[in-house]
Amino acid sequence: FKKAAEMADLVIAISEQTKRDIVEFLKIPEEKIRVVYQGCHQAFKEKYTEEQLKEIKQKFSLPDRFLLNVGTIEERKNLLSVVKALQGTDIPLVVVGKKTKYFQKIEQELAVNKVKALFLENVSMQELAGIYRLAEIFIYPSLFEGFGIPVIEALFSEPPVITSNTSCLPEAGGEHSLYVNPLDVEDIRVKIKQLWDNPEECRFRAEKGLDFAQKFTDEQIFRDLMKVYNELRS
């Protein structure tokens, strides 16, 4: 990648964080890098009927209210901190993602702390979009991301978002997501409770999050890409 980036007339990065990483680690000049964000699947932008959501809820035996986490269950996604943060609460956790060896740590913590958790795999894109819409809160305290597409999926699906204050995630989450130190379990616990106990704040942040998500529409990404290509042609 370093050789290709050196030879390229321009380099497209998927976030300002990625741009900084390319400059720092690959020593590519900042002036030849352009940022074009990623979007998400159309399924997350579509509206679902009450009947459709009811079917999804019944199929996966989802609780009436739940905290949602989406992504491969691996160390950098930091799910263990969420499980620890839920200790002593009655807040159900739903996780959609492939299990790795890291899941053993999650199981051990669940057994000790008696956290209510449901783990789902092999979920279709349409079903996943419905699960997002049924969630009370989406949480994504990842330690590092190139961009963080699950955050964008959540913004379009309209649960409020809690995510990390590190890496590129503030770029993806925008002003009205709630941010945590991903290494601070107590901070995560406080932010979860803040939203869980305040439905009005949840609605406000969800509405503002959907407004912010419009910068990640296919149309906007197309315009940004064409701007880069036209720059090369001129």
Language-model segments: residues:
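Carbohydrate transferase catalytic cores enriched for Leloir-type hexosyltransferases
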Residues: F1-S234
